[in-house]
Amino acid sequence: MSFFTMCVLAAGIGMALGTLGTGIGQGLAVKSAVEGVSRNPGASGKILTTMMIGLAMIESLAIYALVVCLIILFANPYKDIALELAKTVAK
């Protein structure tokens, strides 16, 4: 398996796991917020504000995963080393 194949697989798996965790976390956060509003409708403003801030924090995980995956794909610092090694092996 080549270096670039492994990079693509790592980026795909990393993004999948990052978004899976984000989706589960956001679902649990919204579930808890809806339960809180159903128990105390008067506090819906505070609950909504806190939930939005929490969702923004949770969403940052997906953004960080995307950035790391893009770095792995397009700005990999080991790309030159892998190309040199491939040229050496091919000779």
From Swiss-Prot:
GO molecular function terms listed in the Swiss-Prot or TrEMBL record: lipid binding; proton-transporting ATP synthase activity, rotational mechanism
Family affiliation: Belongs to the ATPase C chain family.
Membrane topology: Multi-pass membrane protein
Compartmental location: Cell inner membrane
Residues passing through the membrane, by range: 4-24, 53-73
Keyword match Lipoprotein: no
Keyword field contains Aminoacyl-tRNA synthetase: no
InterPro entries in alphabetical order: ATP_synth_csu_bac/chlpt (IPR005953), ATP_synth_F0_csu (IPR000454), ATP_synth_F0_csu_DDCD_BS (IPR020537), ATPase_proteolipid_c-like_dom (IPR002379), F/V-ATP_Csub_sf (IPR035921)
Entry superkingdom: Bacteria
Gene name linked to the record: atpE
Disulfide bond sites: none
Complex and partners: F-type ATPases have 2 components, F(1) - the catalytic core - and F(0) - the membrane proton channel. F(1) has five subunits: alpha(3), beta(3), gamma(1), delta(1), epsilon(1). F(0) has three main subunits: a(1), b(2) and c(10-14). The alpha and beta chains form an alternating ring which encloses part of the gamma chain. F(1) is attached to F(0) by a central stalk formed by the gamma and epsilon chains, while a peripheral stalk is formed by the delta and b chains.
Protein's name in the database: ATP synthase subunit c
Site feature: Reversibly protonated during proton transport: 59
